[in-house]
Amino acid sequence: MMQLTPDLLISAYAQGIFPMADEFGAINFYDPNPRAIFPLDSFYVPRRLARTVRSGRFTIRVDSAFRAVMLACAEPGPGRASTWISDSIVAAYEELHEQGFAHSVEAWREGVLVGGLYGVALRGLFAGESMFSRERDASKVALVHLVERLRAGGYVLLDTQFLGSDHFRQFGVVEIPRSEYKRRLAAALRVDASFS
């Protein structure tokens, strides 16, 4: 079985590919066409969600519970008995996190982790990997905070890989051809962005 290492993962993201485990735990790499991205300059926050963000209902933390976020994202959900986030993927991304390339944005309420997301930051690219929510809007609020952080840090590309669920559409997610994604990725890798 393929051994995921931080160097292998960084090389993969720099080429526009990413890993997922199949139902047997085997790691496969993907390079979808088309590719889904959130345009950072036109990311749209619906009015109701903007009120929730402003309300302070959730406390947002960054990188305080990276492993817990990954494990929550890996939990089975409605219509999904298993997930592509295997034990080996968790271990590899924890190493990336320790090296400063993988980050989590977490929504907490009354001291309990109720939502969040994680992904990989490489130069001007942030590749969103997965998100979870145990309370309404928790992961969406984390996403809004992620976008604010990426804009402030000089990022130029927020990759969401696949179109995913319909709720992404409300934020302005778009699909672009693989060739256009690779062009934008090359430009993003020339950008000196900062997540902190």
Question: Where are the regions that the model predicts?
Answer:
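N-acyltransferase acceptor-side catalytic subdomain
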Residues: 1-196
